[in-house]
């Protein structure tokens, strides 16, 4: 079967060619794109923290998990969409691929409207449940409500980019996100610093930048290969296809939401430690991206690689791709951990001038980051299993380990050592259990459709 490569659309068949080189070059734009996407919120936090103070920065940090849990649903659906799109592309089934594109557009429109309304209505209630301090409650509510106005754009960009990645194109989404990132910096300067719109200006800058990036992705989808390009008159809810997307995507969505819910429980306990700890953790999660984003990019690349290769029955090539992704991840993580820990005070000083917040943030980093190599195995193995279309087992593994066990460990820590450092130990402890379960499942090959189909009926 010839490689399905289009110069015009930058699509690429990942079922042929040198695996290491393909994963490396495919993951680089993914890393850059994720870095730019996180840059949005990082710039928000820098402007808010420097111009408006640590209370405003804490309000943004306390709002983060609410925003993530809403996006988690769509991220999960995009997994299902990506697996199916990559499979149909690798098989050359372009009519089915067109159905995926247009069903995805219909789902995006409907669910974006519903979640936007719910987010705006229930923002204050959820912040109260999270034990958010009264002094930052108002600004947290304002930030969430304004941010929700960009939900359709954020979802459109991420889902549309997921389709492009499934077709082997990771470069174009990165370029569009870069353009949006530049707009975000300009918007923050104008709305927050120059026009003094406060935390509302930070959210407004995000709305403008995300809308621009989403518009570029939609334009790209509209101008793809005529056999599967987006046409607005074809947008529909293909119920059989939607059920298949939900079959794969809903477990992935639940997995994402479960992780976020468990982190909300963690954040709730952090909120009880005071504004300094809240601000320190908000800054830590930004600093952590230097390590996390390359791992996430490798996971995304591995998932697309697996989806295409499993789709055409190349199981051994899929396994080699998983192993190479882990090797790459360990090498990159070793370097990034060393840099972050060596320059910890400088990194946290980017977000605040408060010496106590910097000290707490650095202490958190020295607890968690030495164990971050575990997250390489977690991300790559989970992405590989999801890429095969087997999302239900990973959901159960994540549910048990990163929700039930994590909350149990947290309760013990808050009883014996209720400090910011104590809370930090929750992450490496639960990573150990999660990686052990994922490794067992991967080695069992229950995800392998060839092996499963070859089993005799009982």
Label each PLM-derived region with a short phrase:
Residues 39-57, 127-134, 190-197, 257-290, ...:
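Helix-terminus/linker motif at the lipid-water interface of multi-pass membrane proteins
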Residues 30, 34, 46, 83, ...:
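Transmembrane alpha-helix boundary and packing residues in multipass membrane permease domains
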Residues 14-51, 65-80, 84, 109-116, ...:
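N-terminal transmembrane alpha-helices
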Residues 57-117, 154-173, 280-344, 375-398:
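Small-residue-rich hydrophobic transmembrane alpha-helices
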Residues 78, 146-165, 173-184, 202-217, ...:
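Short runs within selected transmembrane alpha-helices of multi-pass transporters and secretion channels
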Residues 25-44, 146, 157, 180, ...:
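Transmembrane helical elements of multi-pass membrane transporters/channels
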Residues 54-65, 144, 203, 275-290, ...:
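Small-residue hotspots at the loop-to-helix junctions and early N-terminal turns
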Residues 1-27, 85-150, 194-250, 306-371, ...:
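Short alpha-helical transmembrane segments in multi-pass integral membrane proteins
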């Amino acid at each position: 079967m010839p490689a399905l490569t289009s110069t015009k659309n930058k699509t690429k068949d990942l079922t042929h060619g040198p695996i290491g080189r393909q994963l490396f070059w495919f993951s680089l734009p993914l890393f850059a794109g994720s870095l730019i996407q996180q840059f949005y919120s990082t710039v928000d936090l820098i402007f808010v923290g420097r111009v408006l103070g640590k209370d405003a920065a804490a309000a943004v940090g306390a709002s983060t998990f609410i925003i993530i849990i809403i996006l988690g649903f769509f991220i999960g659906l995009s997994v299902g969409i990506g697996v199916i799109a990559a499979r149909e592309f690798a098989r050359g089934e372009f009519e089915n691929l067109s159905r995926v594109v247009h069903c995805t557009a219909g789902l995006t429109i409907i669910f974006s409207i519903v979640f936007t309304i719910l987010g705006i209505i229930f923002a204050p209630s959820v912040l109260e449940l999270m034990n958010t301090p009264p002094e930052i409650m108002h600004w947290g509510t304002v930030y969430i409500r304004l941010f929700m106005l960009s939900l359709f754009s954020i979802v459109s960009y991420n889902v549309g980019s997921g389709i492009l990645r499934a077709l082997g194109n990771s470069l174009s989404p990165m370029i569009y996100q870069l353009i949006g990132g530049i707009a975000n910096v300009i918007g923050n300067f104008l709305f927050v610093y120059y026009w003094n719109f406060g935390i509302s200006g930070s959210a407004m800058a995000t709305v403008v930048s995300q809308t621009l990036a989403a518009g570029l992705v939609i334009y790209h989808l509209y101008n793809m290969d005529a056999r599967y390009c987006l046409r607005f008159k074809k947008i529909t809810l293909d119920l059989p296809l939607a059920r298949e997307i939900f079959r794969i995507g809903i477990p992935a969505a639940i997995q994402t939401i479960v992780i976020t819910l468990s982190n909300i429980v963690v954040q709730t306990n952090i909120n009880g430690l005071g504004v300094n700890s809240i601000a320190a953790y908000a800054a830590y999660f930004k600093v952590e991206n230097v390590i996390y984003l390359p791992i996430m990019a490798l996971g995304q690349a591995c998932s697309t690689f697996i989806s295409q290769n499993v789709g055409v029955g190349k199981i051994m090539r899929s396994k080699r791709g998983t192993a190479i992704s882990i090797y790459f991840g360990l090498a990159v993580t070793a370097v990034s951990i060393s840099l972050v820990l060596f320059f910890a005070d400088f990194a946290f000083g980017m977000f605040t001038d408060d010496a106590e917040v910097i000290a707490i943030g650095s202490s958190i980093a020295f607890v968690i980051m030495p164990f971050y190599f575990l997250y390489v195995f977690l991300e790559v193995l989970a992405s590989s299993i999801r890429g095969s279309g087997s999302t239900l087992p990973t959901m159960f593994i994540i549910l048990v380990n990163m929700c039930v066990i994590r909350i149990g460990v947290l309760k013990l820590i808050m009883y014996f050592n209720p400090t910011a450092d104590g809370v930090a130990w929750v992450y490496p402890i639960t990573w150990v259990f999660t990686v052990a379960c994922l490794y067992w499942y991967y080695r069992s090959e229950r995800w392998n459709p060839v092996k499963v189909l070859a089993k005799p009926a009982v």
